[in-house]
Amino acid sequence: MENEGFHVLHVYVDADACPVKDEVYRVAERYGLNVTLVANSPLRVPLHERIRLVVVGAGFDAADDWIATNAGAGDIVVTADIPLASRCLKNGARVIGSTGKPFTDATIGQALAGRELSQHLRESGRLSHH
């Protein structure tokens, strides 16, 4: 979107399990950002011209696929999903985790490797959720 010749930042939120939606709304209001929340099922969102909800259905990774397809250079993605963060970085988007920590090209490889290792250890029974 253009606003008086400037790119208006667009924020995409991986919304189903996002614990910081209220913070996103406040920042978006303060800075005039457009926000799209993407979810597998309907969510309650504030009635505001700059906030919209896209419900993609229950398919595996449907919300991730929608966000990765639509978020591009200059956009911001809020997600805790490391593979989605990687996809969005490749598209030129900036990515912030739900803890506020940014994912970057320099850190995403390590994050993906750590995720893979944890998944492998869980599957082999060497790591549990205590």
Where are these regions (language model features)?
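Nuclease catalytic cores that cleave nucleic-acid phosphodiester bonds
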Residues: 2-130
